[in-house]
């Protein structure tokens, strides 16, 4: 009986170990240009931060989730300890300054492979949509 049960459950476990789906569909077509602190430019696509399609930022005592799809630009204004002050420029032209963890890990893909960076190591991120 144990052999039969184990033979039935082994395929289930194998299928359950499939690879993750990757970036959510809302960010798959987003391309970004990252300007790092050394002045180097990096062209990436399908960006995520902390594995999410939005940024968790603070404005005073309130935490917000800002969708990457609504952004045109992220500028890191300053880094002090574990906190980075960033300016978000939205597609509608509005700008706002927020606090975020300086150790926020963002990822993307490039022609070279997968890329990752911390916001504290970046000057600016420009969002490009519809470009080839």
Swiss-Prot record:
Keywords assigned by UniProt, alphabetized: Signal
Superkingdom classification of source: Bacteria
Signal peptide (UniProt feature, chain positions): 1-18
Protein name: Uncharacterized protein aq_796
